[in-house]
Structures are given as C-alpha cells and as structure tokens.
C-alpha cells in the first residue's frame, strides 16, 4: 500500500510577511491520518484554524489567501503549499502568528528545506490521489487552464509577458512531475515583479516586505537583482510553482495533465472549484504497489539527499 505522509517532528522558522513587512513565525507540525493541511492563526485568542480547501480560497489578488466565514485570513500560502505538494505531504498542522505566511526568499526552496529538516513519516492509511477522468477547463478572456486525463502528473504551461527580459527567456515549459524534478528544477524559482508595480503597492501599504531578497525585480528593460536569475527560465518556472501550490487545495495529489496559458491564482482556483463540482470528472484512488503509482514521490528516506 502507498501510505499517507506527515512530518516526523515539529519545525519552526521566522521570516518576513510580504505585505506587512513584519516578522512572522511559522511552525509545521505532524497531524493524524486524513487531517489534510490545516492552517492555524496563533496570534488570535482563541487561535483560529482554517482547513486548506478550495472553497476557503476567497482572495486571489497577488497571492492565494484562505479566508473563513468570519473574515479571518491567512495569505500567501502558495509557495508553502507547492513544497507540501512536491514532497507529497498529506497531513500537517501549520501554525502562523500573523495573517500571512512568511515570504522567505520568494520561492518554495526554504519550505522544502524545512520539511526535509522535519523529516517525513509514512502513516498507517492509504494515500488518496485525485485522478482526472474527464477534461475540465476554465477561461477568462484569452487566459485558460485545463485538467485532463493523463497517467502521471504533467504540466504544460505557457506565459506571455511583453517585457524584453522575459521575452528573451523560455516562456513555455512541459514537465512530468517527480519530487526530484520539483526540488531541482522548480522549487528555487522566485516570484517576480515590476518596479513600477512595487512603487504603487507600497504607496498603498502593500508589499511592504518585498525586496530583491525575496523577489526578482525588473524595471522596463532588465532584471535589477545583482545576482540575476537562478534559472534562465525562472519566470515560467515560478508560475508553475504557484500552480502546484494553488492546485493542492484540491486536497490530494492530482493524477492528470494540467495545461495553462497566462493563468494565475484566480484562474487556478476556479479550475480546482470547477473540477470538484463536476463529480463525474474525477475519482479518488489509492495504490497497493509502488510500481503502480503514476505520480513519483520520492521515498521519505531519500528526500534528504535531493
């Protein structure tokens, strides 16, 4: 049987909130089987827990935010969720003492490191996969996103930015998911933004924690970061990273192909909601043998060496 996973022990880290600019402490803890991913605001009294479900994503402007019925929010979850998805973590309690997850370096890599430091433990329950059996597609103008049947998890993603630096880079990527491919080729890709937008956001008390320490910043012509890019195609890779995180609020690893053109947090979430609403388009499956699993998650003991 292929088992569910959680972390072996609690792990904690501190970073900066992208929008507030304030210090944020994050704590990732083990959780029992079938818990899923639950986020908890410990700065509130009493503390408030929000399950990571598609219908709890109620804001997608510049990030993905979970918001409960009382309006309590936890923002910027997507990079952490990409790491959870990439390492195949099914169950975890994530405590945070602020209304946002720390931005860290703008990628998923610090969260991958945290999860590897905590260790990954298999649990005595079958891991469930969300298998796509009929295509589901959402559109917004010329932007679109689609999930369709595929034996594995494949991503086919295209961006289209009218900027000389991005135009010079590869704006289309196809990848077959595996933990090692995610960690090596995707997880280090940072969020990116334009100087003109950052100035506007700061004038409106947003992105106060944003800097070249946690984002690729571009002016009208070039990348301003002194060290340049981590990957030649870092822009499209970061959009794929975001999509991994956004899709994980479906609650399970997906078996299927995700194709997208110019999509972002809003359309990604619309796709997950449309999928879950169309109950004949998917089924939950589990596997008895490693050889039968179409999505390759590295065994826990090997993760530390990726």
From Swiss-Prot:
Keyword Lipid biosynthesis recorded? yes
EC number of the protein: 3.5.1.108
Positions of disulphide bridges? none
What Gene Ontology terms for biological process does this UniProt record contain? lipid A biosynthetic process
**MF GO annotations:** metal ion binding; UDP-3-O-acyl-N-acetylglucosamine deacetylase activity
One Gene Ontology cellular component: membrane
Q: Name any cofactors this protein relies on.
A: Zn(2+)
Known Gene3D superfamilies for this protein?
lpxc deacetylase, domain 1, lpxc deacetylase, domain 2
What reaction does this catalyse? a UDP-3-O-[(3R)-3-hydroxyacyl]-N-acetyl-alpha-D-glucosamine + H2O = a UDP-3-O-[(3R)-3-hydroxyacyl]-alpha-D-glucosamine + acetate
Q: Which residues bind Zn(2+)?
A: 79, 238, 242
Enumerate the Pfam families for this protein: LpxC (PF03331)
Catalytic residues in the record? 265 (proton donor)
Q: Identify the stretch annotated as signal peptide in this record.
A: none
Q: Which keywords fit this entry according to its UniProt record?
A: Hydrolase, Lipid A biosynthesis, Lipid biosynthesis, Lipid metabolism, Metal-binding, Zinc
Pathway in which the depicted protein is active: Glycolipid biosynthesis; lipid IV(A) biosynthesis; lipid IV(A) from (3R)-3-hydroxytetradecanoyl-[acyl-carrier-protein] and UDP-N-acetyl-alpha-D-glucosamine: step 2/6
The function of this protein is: Catalyzes the hydrolysis of UDP-3-O-myristoyl-N-acetylglucosamine to form UDP-3-O-myristoylglucosamine and acetate, the committed step in lipid A biosynthesis.
Say which family it is in. Answer: Belongs to the LpxC family.
- Recorded protein name is UDP-3-O-acyl-N-acetylglucosamine deacetylase
């Amino acid at each position: 049987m292929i088992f569910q996973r959680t972390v072996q022990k609690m792990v904690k880290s501190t970073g900066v909130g992208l929008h507030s600019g304030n210090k944020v402490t994050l704590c990732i803890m083990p959780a029992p089987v079938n818990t899923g991913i639950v986020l908890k605001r410990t700065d509130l009294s009493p503390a408030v827990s929000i399950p990571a479900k598609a219908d709890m994503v109620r804001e997608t402007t510049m990030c993905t935010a979970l918001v409960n019925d009382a309006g309590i929010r936890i923002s910027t979850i997507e990079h952490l969720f990409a790491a959870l998805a990439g390492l195949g973590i099914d169950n975890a309690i994530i405590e945070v003492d602020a209304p946002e997850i720390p931005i860290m370096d703008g990628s998923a890599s610090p969260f991958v490191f945290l999860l590897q430091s905590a260790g990954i433990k298999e649990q005595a329950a079958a891991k469930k996969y969300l298998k796509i059996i009929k295509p589901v597609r959402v559109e917004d103008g010329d932007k679109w996103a689609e999930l369709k049947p595929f034996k594995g998890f494949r991503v086919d993603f295209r961006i289209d930015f009218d900027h000389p630096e991005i135009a010079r880079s590869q704006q289309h990527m196809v990848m077959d998911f595996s933990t090692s491919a995610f960690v090596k080729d995707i997880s280090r890709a940072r969020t990116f933004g334009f100087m003109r937008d950052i100035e506007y956001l700061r004038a409106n008390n947003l992105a106060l924690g944003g800097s070249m320490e946690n984002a690729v910043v571009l002016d009208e012509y070039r990348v301003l970061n002194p060290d340049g890019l981590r990957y030649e195609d870092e822009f499209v890779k970061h959009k794929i990273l975001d999509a991994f995180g956004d899709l994980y609020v479906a609650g399970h690893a997906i078996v299927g192909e995700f194709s997208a053109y110019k999509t972002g947090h809003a359309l990604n979430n619309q796709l997950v909601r449309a999928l879950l609403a169309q109950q004949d388009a998917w089924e939950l499956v589990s596997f008895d043998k490693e050889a039968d699993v179409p999505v390759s998650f590295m065994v826990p003991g090997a993760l530390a060496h990726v």
